[in-house]
Amino acid sequence: MTAFTRDGTPVAMEGGGLDFRKREAGGGMSVAFIPLPEGTDLAPALKGLDGDLCQCPHWGYVFKGRIRMRTATGEEVYEAGQAYYWGPGHAPEALEDVDVVEFSPTAEFDAVIDHVKAQAGG
């Protein structure tokens, strides 16, 4: 059994108010601590992925704020106090400062992170 903290988790991406931390949790899954500043829209960074959307599933919990999740069929807003499952094919936008923790399949998550970093030039 394992436990993780935000401070003990390595930074995967940072800049512009983003301090995205991720580590392998075991069983082919990773845990991520993700604060997103209000107005952060990941759609531009997802361009080039299938459907221009994140294709990695995520299970998580919103600790703070509100986040809009856009899909090919519409959108839904999630807010503090809600647990979620986001299936493949989504693009998040922070409507307020957001703080989430989520669990995702490592291989799929790493592919999306690598793509986002490449889009950002890093």
Please place each PLM-identified region on the residue numbering:
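A short, N-terminal "cap"/entry segment at the start of jelly-roll beta-barrel domains
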Residues: M1-A43, D50-G51, K117, G122
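Short, surface-exposed beta-strand-loop junctions and turns on beta-sheet-rich folds
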Residues: G39, E75-V77, A107-F109
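Short acidic-glycine-tyrosine-enriched beta hairpin
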Residues: T71-H90
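Short strand-coil-strand connectors
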Residues: G26-G27, R70-G74, L95-D97
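Conserved hydrophobic/aromatic beta-strand scaffold that supports enzyme active sites
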Residues: F20-K22, V31-F33, W59, E75, ...
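Ligand-binding loop in jelly-roll beta-barrel domains
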Residues: M29, P88-I113
